[in-house]
A protein has these predicted regions:
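Sequence signature of WD/YWTD-type beta-propeller architectures
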Residues: 2-395
Length: 395
């Protein structure tokens, strides 16, 4: 009997030790983001809801049955833009102008700038000046001008206006710790923190000719877009706080959207349409605001504006998550606790249509951000947030 008791006692001891090892060593209680989180059966597939309030015509048959993606850059990329170049092509005695897309992008680790030709599938390094750890990139119409944003060794945000010339990057620094910058054509909008809130200043692509664009009593803001006639200012989105979107036009402030938890938004260039998302019940919903009709139209797809890009004034391209895991949106996605698996869709804000372009079952998974499309809407790029790689897609 004593031997049996001793044997059972030893087994119990091993069970307790194993439990202790799991609880104190193997169980992750650090609160750090999990790059590949598992939510079990908590997520639900994205379906097209049968809702009388959603006045959209939806076609989920992909335009391209066979999806051909090109991995443009294997290392993480900090920023990308697709431009349209015009070149002269001569065939026999006839010369004509041909428009072709070209992709500019920045390697995140080195800060080197590259130019990629989709038709030739070749990339050329246009700057070998090293800027390690670039976090954010903004572009101008002038392809030789660029804005780099990164955190220096003292934890300060540096903003650098660069000029690409002769294979190197030269330029100048703006003030440290600017909370936000945005570009439009060849103008730069830089946001400064003041005792009263925030101020926005417009300058040229070299930081000259600065003039006041707006004054706000808001401290924590983003600038999702900036155009010739307005600057869009968004309160930083938090799922538990009501956010607002303001337009600053001709010196006046107009509240476009407000009282929306976790509000994140992206206006088109004219400011006529705004795609936005709202946090609710550990998920989110999406809608379009038609400023001309002062009408909000619920979208049949759960899109985050950070995963979209406007083509023309009414056409929106979005990487749409196929499953929405339960979480606090958008911050849990920002912080890396959540990764999505996306498909590519096109939404027409004026016609009220949504059409699937491609599903990436064989090539993915992709959690697409930093979408860019050329003027002719022939070529689209996105960065896969899962690993930072850059991908191109022929529309």
């Amino acid at each position: 009997m004593n031997r049996i008791a001793i044997f059972l006692g030893i087994i119990l001891l091993f069970v307790l030790l194993a439990g202790g090892v799991y609880f104190f060593v193997l169980r992750d209680t650090s609160g750090t983001p999990n790059n590949n989180p598992s939510f079990g059966s908590g997520g639900s597939p994205i379906t097209i809801p049968e809702d009388d309030n959603i006045d959209f015509v939806v076609d989920d048959t992909p335009i391209q049955e066979k999806t051909i993606l090109t991995q443009i850059h294997e290392a993480p990329v900090a920023g990308v833009i697709v431009r349209t170049n015009e070149i002269e092509v001569t065939v026999g005695s006839t010369t004509e102008s041909v428009r072709t897309p070209v992709v500019q992008y920045v390697d995140k680790q080195t800060g080197h700038v590259f130019s990629y030709d989709p038709e030739e599938n070749t990339a050329e390094r246009t700057s070998n000046t090293t800027f390690p750890g670039i976090q954010d990139v903004h572009w101008f119409n002038d392809p030789s001008k660029v804005v780099f944003r990164y955190v220096n060794g003292d934890g300060e945000i540096e903003t650098y206006l660069g000029d690409l010339a002769g294979g190197s990057l030269n330029g100048s620094y703006l003030d440290v710790d600017l909370p936000a910058v945005q570009t439009f054509n060849d103008s730069l909008l830089s946001v400064h923190t003041t005792e009263r809130g925030s101020e926005g200043f417009i300058s040229d692509n070299e930081g000259r000719g600065e003039s006041l664009s707006f004054e706000s009593n808001l401290l924590s803001i983003l600038v999702p877009s900036f155009a010739e006639s307005f600057a869009a200012v968004l309160t930083k989105p938090v799922s538990t706080l009501a956010g607002a979107l303001y337009f600053y036009e001709n010196g006046s402030q107009k509240r476009i959207l407000g009282g929306i938890n976790g509000l994140t938004a992206l206006p088109n260039e004219a400011g006529e349409f705004v795609v936005f998302s709202e946090s609710s019940d550990r998920s989110y919903t999406s809608a379009l605001y038609d400023r001309g009709d002062d009408e909000i139209k619920a979208l049949p797809l759960a899109v985050l504006p950070e995963k979209c890009v406007w083509g023309d004034e009414t056409t929106l391209y979005c990487m749409v998550p196929e499953i929405i895991p339960p979480a606090n949106y958008p911050e849990h996605w920002y912080q890396g606790y959540i990764s999505f698996t996306d498909s590519l869709w096109r939404i027409n804000a004026a016609l009220g249509t949504a059409r699937a372009i491609a599903f990436f079952d064989e090539s993915g998974p992709f959690d697409g951000i930093n979408l860019s499309v050329d003027e002719d809407e022939d070529y689209l790029t996105f960065i896969n947030r899962r690993d930072g790689t850059l991908w191109g897609f022929d529309l």
